[in-house]
Amino acid sequence: MSGAPPSYSFVALPPRAKDGLVVFGKNSARPRDEVQEVVYFPAVDHDAESKVECTYISIDQVPRTHAIVISRPAWLWGAEMGANEHGVCIANEAINAREPAAETEALLGMDLVRLGLERGTTAKEALDIIVSLLDEHGQGGNYYEDAHSCHSFQSAYLLVDRDEAWVLETVGKYWAAERITEGVRCICNHLSLATKLDEEHPELRTYAQSQGWWTGDDEFNFAQVFSPADDRLDCCAGQDSLEKQEESITVQTMINILRDKASGVCIDSESFLTTASIVSVLPQNRSSPCIHYFTGTPDPSRSIFKPFIFVDDVKLVPKAQSPCFGDDDPAKKEPRFQEKPDRRHELYKAHEWARAVIESDEEQGRTLRKTMLELEKQGLEAMDEILSSPEPPDPAEVGDLFYDCVDTEMKFFK
Amino acid sequence: MDEEYDVIVLGTGLTECILSGIMSVNGKKVLHMDRNPYYGGESSSITPLEELYKRFQILEGPPESMGRGRDWNVDLIPKFLMANGQLVKMLLYTEVTRYLDFKVVEGSFVYKGGKIYKVPSTETEALASNLMGMFEKRRFRKFLVFVANFDENDPKTFEGVDPQNTSMRDVYRKFDLGQDVIDFTGHALALYRTDDYLDQPCLETINRIKLYSESLARYGKSPYLYPLYGLGELPQGFARLSAIYGGTYMLNKPVDDIIMENGKVVGVKSEGEVARCKQLICDPSYIPDRVQKAGQVIRIICILSHPIKNTNDANSCQIIIPQNQVNRKSDIYVCMISYAHNVAAQGKYIAIASTTVETAEPEKEVEPALELLEPIDQKFVAISDLYEPIDDGSESQVFCSCSYDATTHFETTCNDIKDIYKRMAGSAFDFENMKRKQNDVFGEADQ
């Protein structure tokens, strides 16, 4: 069993988060050479009886899917994290549990993130959709684009909307969930649910008893029952980072946490890299828009967060999307992953130049870094104005917002 | 003297020297006189430095820290050349640049909220600048694309704007530009000194913004050029042009009287002799009874031992203080040049603050500019009257130039030249009029 990738997902709710804004963030840790893309899908009506091709399996499509914007490894169908037009954000975490994850191809955790976003109008509704699909189709399959080994994991999810957050942790088809209405919460690559369970699979406890993991006599503690024997249950660098913030949590706070390598929240190791990040701000006041910031490039400490706002005519951003190989994609053929095509998008390639400069040329690197942070700051300031404004933003003005920011960023990368 | 000329020119300011050159190239017999022993008049560069102190009656003269007096060439009128502007066109057509060297001014800055911001000179500089917020920048970019594409002869480029009727205020409104962006556009790009242009038809403003962009594109960095050894080189260059086409120059020649007969000029008397002419060109100082005062300009020449703060140690720059940043009607300008242009001793900088006078306390009016320049080693304060001619010369055939205004470029000067030319020659000025002819006396014709 290989170690689960050390991703971190965060939520802060008012009043712990500032100004009536729910703040959500995730660092996605994945294999170093993997490219993540940022993709927008508009809302679509679907034919009755139609199917949707997820990463490995095909399932029934619903009549209508919501507009979504997601960050995902370019080879798979689902998402590591993302948001929908209704202000729902979802992130997943790969987890090792006592019970090995199925290698049989089914739905990946990433597929369920996307399906939850496409179908749920609230965090709770998305949770119900995910557990229903889990029950119907199960979870399983390779999490990595690797022909030689199957890396499979159980999945946990952080689901957030303007009002509340839910932590959902799943083992096979069994699951437990906790509702969060205040304070801060982080989930990482360990089970974290303990005795406070607001929802659970109806057979969760009987299953645990039947496996001999729970006697039925003591209080049911989900993480204790389902974690591998050698897991250190109380360890979460992200939760520590979040809790020790003395000021109210803002978007900038969240960004700073995601950039922090000393705490281990930002990963740059031999096997894993934080390959993409997201921060979302969800105003409890519904007349303000939700704003979602994506990097689209590896390592948030060397990337900038760029804003996205849902409106009816969002401009597509080809430069942050990887090339599409259609049915010829080695990820779609069996046996899987016999080749590894170049999945780098234009922004990724431009950013490679910037990363090389930052690493090799101290003076030029520092100047470039400073310029990019200044650009990011201007974006954050503009978004703060939108959130402070009594009127919603002009859709014509924000439809090409993410497109423009990607385009601008690339102009600074030779 | 005691000869007959087509045109007599009095005063060797830039305007007069350019007109002298044009007239000579076009076959007129020209006599050019100046009461001073040097070229330039109001637009001269003062050298050595001791002369500047004397001129401003600072009796102790320059301290030793100023270095060799001969290293200094201090302009009395602070201006830069716009790289795609009319004066550069005149220089190129006349090939006067053959005798001159220019440097690109390193930057232009605009004052906002007590600080100065670089006027961006590249796209990435504009994107990185915090002179505007993100959404303002995006609207502004759309506006600039509109201006760049605008062609007054192609209605398809108009986007619903009427160049002769739509006011500039309405164009700004169409692009939803905020007040800060409007100030920046009108004062740092279109280089208007006041806000009167807002209610005028937009064509002139669009053309001015185009001029700025085209000048900027010429050399990068900034849209301005400056001649080594100072602006005084310019009138001399044009005077040389006039001379090689047969123009006669007399410096250090007092003008005792301008002789009129039946309301028409017939000659000039100097030291007892009379030179006769059909037409006369002069600057306002030669005909005080035929000009009227049109305001005042204050210019404060400051010598510094440091670049101006927040200009990235620029050796040369312009700073524009838009008038409503300091509750005035007219902008305040700062032009800074330095030893790098062979106009000052090593390590020294010359910054000149100027504006149109609006109150009885003009020095107080330029204080926001002087604060940007501190510490100042030495200040020279000049308050000049602005004159314009009373008559257009149609009867008198006396054509008087206007005084130099407070702008930091020569476009108004060139407009004055074109206007005088039209009144003298009876036809619109064409830059082709300045092209060298085959018959120049030194055989320097282009083949």
From Swiss-Prot, chain A:
Molecular-function GO term, any one: dipeptidase activity
One Pfam family recorded for the sequence: Peptidase_C69
Further comment found in the protein's record: 'Secern' is an archaic English term meaning 'secrete'.
UniProt protein name: Secernin-1
Function: Regulates exocytosis in mast cells. Increases both the extent of secretion and the sensitivity of mast cells to stimulation with calcium.
Family recorded in the similarity comment: Belongs to the peptidase C69 family. Secernin subfamily.
UniProt-listed GO biological process terms: exocytosis; proteolysis; regulation of synaptic vesicle cycle
GO CC terms of this entry: cytoplasm; nuclear membrane; presynapse
Predominant place of localization: cytoplasm
Subcellular location: Cytoplasm
Alphabetic keyword roster: Cytoplasm, Exocytosis
Cytoplasm keyword on record: yes
Source species taxonomy: Eukaryota, Metazoa, Chordata, Craniata, Vertebrata
Swiss-Prot record, chain B:
Annotated protein name in UniProt: Rab GDP dissociation inhibitor alpha
Any one GO molecular function term: Rab GDP-dissociation inhibitor activity
Keywords tagged on the record: Cytoplasm, Golgi apparatus, GTPase activation, Phosphoprotein
Organism: Mus musculus (Mouse)
Residue positions where Phosphoserine is found in the record: 427
SUPFAM superfamilies noted in UniProt: FAD/NAD(P)-binding domain
GO cellular component terms listed in the entry, alphabetical order: axon; endoplasmic reticulum; Golgi apparatus; midbody; myelin sheath; neuronal cell body; presynaptic cytosol; protein-containing complex
Gene: Gdi1
Its job: Regulates the GDP/GTP exchange reaction of most Rab proteins by inhibiting the dissociation of GDP from them, and the subsequent binding of GTP to them. Promotes the dissociation of GDP-bound Rab proteins from the membrane and inhibits their activation. Promotes the dissociation of RAB1A, RAB3A, RAB5A and RAB10 from membranes.
Tissue distribution of the protein: High expression in brain, lower in other tissues.
Family indicated by similarity: Belongs to the Rab GDI family.
